[in-house]
């Protein structure tokens, strides 16, 4: 398995434009979720980890969300995002390893998951869940999409099943929604689960 745990792996992918899973737009289910949020949500602390080209971060910014943090450990997509959104607060663009973020320094009301879970080595999925729970404030939420298929491959994206995901998340989260997405991007119809879960007290 290629070393997806290293920033160099992802930096090279972006430099070579070898990011076949990139949709080039905001994911429709996540756009729909964002669009129904109340005005009061626009000041909440939101994390988008492993954001890549960060279309969702850009959309949140355009809609007036003022406390969104983008994290990726490849410099290339962060630099590209900063070029596209010169008014985005630079202190919220973090080039770092998600697993090394300090919960003492960072706490979020909710996290948006979009093709990050599928990019990490599957052996780190429990570690992902633990770190995600640690970075969320009490009653914090994890919102997003997970692939609902096994790609049977040794490189990202790495898929899985609903039953497998439940086993990973149930220890630290109350799963409110983990169901097939009805409004996925056409090429992903039938292969995504929409998730909404709340960190356990």
Residue ranges of each PLM-predicted region?
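Class I (Rossmann-like) S-adenosyl-L-methionine-dependent methyltransferase catalytic domain
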Residues: 1-48, 52-105, 120-201
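Short catalytic micro-motifs in class I SAM-dependent methyltransferases
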Residues: 115-119
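A conserved beta-strand element that flanks and buttresses the S-adenosyl-L-methionine
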Residues: 112
